[in-house]
């Protein structure tokens, strides 16, 4: 299947002791999307302190831009955020200046292609009638190509380490779309599960490219797929998690998989060799959502909505502050990845959703 090129050229704290991170000319920064408040909170990972809060309305965007998810260039030179309310993916530099934007309808999750200049974007969970397409954005020119992926409500997203395949999970069907970047073709994989809707929220691929994992919100499972044939993921394991498993990530060494559970307010840690639960991290979680791990694998950062309100979006439930209400601060929980212990809480602007990490080496 050929690409359909649109080419839209457009431009707190609880504290047990933790080891300090050595200073860097370009420190490791954690960017936290605060969807309901239209802001992004920037945290210095060396001190777990808020460096600044980027207000997108003050940057010329709408009153309700809804920043949802963030990815960062590995060297921290640029970061990208999906603005659900403004139908745009925005590129900013290290100084938080807007460099360019790419227009695409209700963008949701983002993923960098590690082998090219491509940035993938799916659709927001809040987009009930989202197009069955993903956006492929050239990160240098910020031009867009829309690709039909043939599954309803495409949301979950992961790109293989070699950049050859992208995996897209459907919120509306038990399906995963596989985009072959070389052949420019899309295949559909049916996820076993009968007629029960699983609601695939998050995806990730192991660092060695051999395994795909997906979270199934309604069944409370981590789905494990073998990628011996990367075009045809094969379901080989189901691992019980907490309630409403959300986004998911492998550790940099591929040894563990970490899953925030939005309704049980905890994080499941899974051994990625035996596919058994190692532990469940408890702490000051409050509707956790996004998760990211520092490049050296030492620290895990989990964004939290911190709201008791649950919105129904086309049959899918998620934590989200009630529109017009006075929202409590969002929060990021910082975890020692080796000890599986919470070490710090950092309060942010209200409604923490997705987050990204980048910059110098911690």
Q: Which residue ranges define each predicted feature?
A:
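Predominantly soluble domains enriched in secretory-pathway, periplasmic, or organellar proteins
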Residues: 13-362
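Bacterial N-terminal signal peptides
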Residues: 3-12
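Extracellular interaction modules
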Residues: 1-4, 351
């Amino acid at each position: 299947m050929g690409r359909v090129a649109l080419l839209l050229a457009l431009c707190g704290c609880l504290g047990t002791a933790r080891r300090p991170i050595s200073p860097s000319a370009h420190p490791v920064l954690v960017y936290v999307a605060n969807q309901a408040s239209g802001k992004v909170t920037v945290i210095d990972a060396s001190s777990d302190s808020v460096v600044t809060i980027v207000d997108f309305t003050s940057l010329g965007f709408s009153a309700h831009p809804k920043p949802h998810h963030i990815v960062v260039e590995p060297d921290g030179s640029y970061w990208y955020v999906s603005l659900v309310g403004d139908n745009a993916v925005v590129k900013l530099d290290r100084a938080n200046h807007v460099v360019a934007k790419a227009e695409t309808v209700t963008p949701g999750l983002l993923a960098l292609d590690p082998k090219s200049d491509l940035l993938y974007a799916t659709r927001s969970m809040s987009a009930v009638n989202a197009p069955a397409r993903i956006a492929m954005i050239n990160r240098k020119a910020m031009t867009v190509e829309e690709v039909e992926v043939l599954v309803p409500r495409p949301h979950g997203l992961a790109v293989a380490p070699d950049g050859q395949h992208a995996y897209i999970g459907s919120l509306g069907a038990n399906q995963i779309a596989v985009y072959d970047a070389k052949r420019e073709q899309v295949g559909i994989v049916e996820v076993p599960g009968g007629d029960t809707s699983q609601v695939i929220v998050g995806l990730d691929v192991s660092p060695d490219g051999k395994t795909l994992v997906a979270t199934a919100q309604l069944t409370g499972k981590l789905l494990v797929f073998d990628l011996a044939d990367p075009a045809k993921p094969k379901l080989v394991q189901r691992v019980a998690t907490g309630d409403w498993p959300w986004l998911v990530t492998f550790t940099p060494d591929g040894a563990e998989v970490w899953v925030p559970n939005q309704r049980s307010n905890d994080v499941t840690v899974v051994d990625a060799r035996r596919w058994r639960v190692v532990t469940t991290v408890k702490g000051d979680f409050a509707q956790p959502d996004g998760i990211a791990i520092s490049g050296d694998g030492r620290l895990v950062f989990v964004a939290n909505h911190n709201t008791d309100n649950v919105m129904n979006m086309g049959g899918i439930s998620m934590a989200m502050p009630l529109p017009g209400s006075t929202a409590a601060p969002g929060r990021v929980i910082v975890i020692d990845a080796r000890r599986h212990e919470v070490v710090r809480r950092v309060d942010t602007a209200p409604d923490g959703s997705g987050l990204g990490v980048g910059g110098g080496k911690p």
